[in-house]
C-alpha cells in the first residue's frame, strides 16, 4: 500500500512544509494520475506499514491543530497555506515538529521531491493538510477554533473540524470527535457513488449511471450518419452495405421509382403543371439514394424566404470542406458552428474529445452561429424551427397534393415500420436514423434536398467554395449500414437493448388478450407455451425499469424515502405474482420460488460474480466488516424462517406407508399432509404469523440502525476538489443532471409496476400448459429455477458488472440484499396474505400445500437453504474473492438444484 503524507501548517506570514517519505510498495505507472490497484498479493509488512502511516498522520494532525490554536490567540486571521507552495522555510517549521516528525524531517533534504518527478519515474501518492481561510466579519465561524482540509492524490478533500472538549474522556465517549463533511453539497454522481461505496442496508445498489454523461458510442452513432470525410471501408462494413442493398435498398428503390412514375403520370407528364415534374424528380433522387446511400451526402439548398427556419439544419458546406481536407479517414465529432468558432478563439487542451476537432488556426468562417449539435441523435424537430410542417412549404399545387398523398399514405408508413424494425435489430441503428431523418426532411422541404457523392465533393481546389455552395447545408452522410458497437448505445441513459425489449411487453399483452382470447387465433405465437416464454422475457426489462426508477428516486431524495420505496416497489411485483399463483392453487410453485431465490442470491449470483471478476484480476480483496448487518440478518432470517418447520418435524407425527400391506418389512415413515387439525391451528399457524411479524420487525430495525442511529458515516465521504476536477467536468459536462427526474422516475415506476402485474397474471395462467407439455417438470422445480432466476436477471447483470470492474464486495452485497428482501419482506407478506385469503373459506375445502404458504418446508429445503447461507457467509468473511471460491459456490448450487429435482421424483 503506497502512502506518502504531505503535511503543512500555517505560520504567521510564511508557510511550513514537511513531507513524510515511506517505501512505495506499489508505485503508480502514471505521473499525473494515481492508479488504483484492486488485486494485490499478501504482504506480511502491510499491517505494520498501515500502523506507521496512521501514527504519522495522527501526530501530524495533533501538531497542526495545536499550532493553529496557539497561533489564533496571537493573530485574528490565518493566512492560507497552499499545498503546492514549495518555497517554504524548512528550519522554522522543524523547530515546532514533534519528535516523531522531527526525525523524519531531518532526512527530507536528501530525499528527492517526487511531486516533480518525470513521467517515467513513479509518483508517490501524497496527502496535504491546509487550513481553511477564516473571515473576520463572519461571526458564525468564530467558535470554530481550527478547520483543516486533507488533500490526497485522488483529488479528494476531507474537511476536519475540531470539536472543543474539556477532557480526554469526553473525546473517547463521543463518536463525533472529528466531523467529516463535504466542502460542497453532493452531486448526483457523488450520491450514487456514496450509496454504492457504503451500500447501506435497504437502499438500492445500481451499477448503470443515474446521471447524464457523454458516451463514446453516442458520438460514434452521430458520426456514422453525419460523416464529413472520405473513409477507408473495411470488408465488414462492405458486407453490411451489400446486405442493405439486397434486403432493403433495392425494394425501397423500386417503391420510390413507382411513386415517381405515378406522380409524373397523374401530374400530366409535366405538360399540365411543372410542380408534378419537380416532385417526381425528387422521388427519383430519393430512390437512387436509398438504393445505395453509402458515401452520398444529403444537403439542403437554402432559400432566402426560409433562412431563419433553416439556420439550424445541418452544418455548413465550408466547414464540411475544411474538415475533409484536414482530417481524411478519421471520424469527426460535429459540433455547432458557435462552439466551433469558440474553439478557434479559445483553443482547448488536447484531450480525447478536443483532439478530433480542427486546429485553432483553421481558416473556416462559420456562416451561421446556431447550427445544432450532433453529439446525440434526437428524433425530433429542432427547437429553433418556426413551425411544424407536414406538407412542405411554398405555394400549393397539384404536384404537391399528389406527392404528399402518396407520401403519407404509402411511403411514410413503410419507411416508419422499416425504421422501427432496423432500430429493434440494434446493430442497424445507423440506417434506422437515416430513414427517420429522411422522413423528417421530406415532410418539411423535399424540393430543397440534394444528393452528391462525397468523393466528388472533395475535389474542390484549396477549399475554394463558390457562392452557390455557400447556400448548402450538409444534412446526412453515412458510409455504413450497421455496426457492432451499437449494443452499447443508450437512449435517455438506458441501454438500447433494454429499451427494445419493452416492445415484447406490449406485444405479449396484445397477443394474449386480443389475438388469443378475443380473436381466437391459432398460430404458434398464440400458444400458451409461447406466451409463457414471452412473459418471462418481458419481466427482464420491467425489472430493469423498476430497479433504475427506484435507484434514481433514492439518489435524489432522502435515505428514508429511498428505503421505503425500495422495500415496497422492489418486492410488490413479485409478491403480486406469487399471490396470483396461490389463488390458482400453485402453492408448490411459490414454495420453490422462495427457496430458489435464496439459493440464487447466496450461491449462483456471488459465484458468477467472483468468476467474472477473476477475468481481469486474479484476486480481489474487500472489507468483510462492511456487510456486518446483512450477514447477521441473513443468518437470523434463516433461523426464524424455519422455526415452524422444526416444530412440525418434532411434534407433527409420522405415518407408516408400506408397499405391500401383507409385508411389514418394506415400509417408510413420512409426515402426513398438512391439515387443519389442532396442531396446525393452535401451534403451526400462530407460530408462522409470529415468525412473519418478527422477520418484518427485523427489517425495520435494520433500516433504523443503518439509516438513523448509525448513519453518520454514510454521507461522510470525501468529494473531489473543484479545482482538481475542473478538466474532468469540462470533458464530461454535467454530472448533476439526472437521466430521469423524480417525477419521470415516479411515472416510469408506476407504469412498470402496472405492466408487471399484468404480465404476472398472464404468466401464472400459462403455467399449466407448460407443465402439460413437459410432464417430467415438477411445479416446485419450475419455481426453483425459472421463476426464481429469470425475473432477477437485472440483479445478476448488475452484480457481474460490479465484479468485472473490481468491486466484488458490491456484487455479494446485491445477493445478500435480495435474499434479505425475500426472507424479511416477501415471505412474511405471503404468510399474512394466505391467511386472509382463506379466512372465509371452508377449511375442509382448502389444500394447505397448494393454496396457502404455511412456512413449513420439506427437510431438503432446510438443508439446502441453511448450508447455502453458511457457505456464503463463511466465504464472505474471508475478505478475498477469486475464481476458486466462485466455482465452489456455483457447484454447490448445481448439486442442490439436482437434489431438488430428485426430491420431486421421490415425492411422486
From Swiss-Prot:
Q: Where is this region: Disordered?
A: 1-20, 68-147
Its subcellular locations are:
Vacuole membrane
Q: What membrane topology does this protein have?
A: Multi-pass membrane protein
Can you quote a single GO CC term?
endoplasmic reticulum membrane
* Regions that span the bilayer: 245-265, 409-429, 495-515, 531-551, 561-581, 588-608, 627-647, 687-707, 747-767, 784-804, 817-837, 852-872, 886-906
Q: For the modification Phosphoserine, which residues carry it?
A: 32, 110, 121
Biased-composition ranges, Polar residues, are 1-15, 102-121
GO biological process, any = sodium ion transport
Domain of life, source organism: Eukaryota
Q: Which Pfam families match?
A: Na_Ca_ex (PF01699), YccF (PF03733)
Residue positions the entry lists as glycosylated = 361
Q: Could you list which ranges are Cytoplasmic topological domains?
A: 1-244, 430-494, 552-560, 609-626, 708-746, 805-816, 873-885
Its Gene Ontology molecular function terms? calcium:proton antiporter activity; potassium:proton antiporter activity; sodium:proton antiporter activity
Topology, Vacuolar side: 266-408, 516-530, 582-587, 648-686, 768-783, 838-851, 907-908
Q: Which residues carry this modification: Phosphothreonine?
A: 26, 33, 118
Where is this protein primarily located?
Answer: membrane
Low complexity composition bias: which ranges?
A: 73-87
Keyword Phosphoprotein present in the record's keywords: the answer is yes
Keywords (A to Z) from UniProt: Glycoprotein, Ion transport, Membrane, Phosphoprotein, Sodium, Sodium transport, Transmembrane, Transmembrane helix, Transport, Vacuole
Query: Which InterPro entries does the protein's record reference?
Result: CaH_exchang, NaCa_Exmemb, NCX_ion-bd_dom_sf, YccF
Family of the protein in this entry: Belongs to the Ca(2+):cation antiporter (CaCA) (TC 2.A.19) family.
- State the protein's purpose: Has a role in promoting intracellular monovalent cation sequestration via the exchange of monovalent cations and especially Na(+) for hydrogen ions across the vacuolar membrane.
More info: Present with 259 molecules/cell in log phase SD medium.
Name of the featured protein: Low affinity vacuolar monovalent cation/H(+) antiporter
**Species lineage:** Eukaryota, Fungi, Dikarya, Ascomycota, Saccharomycotina
Q: Which gene encodes it?
A: VNX1
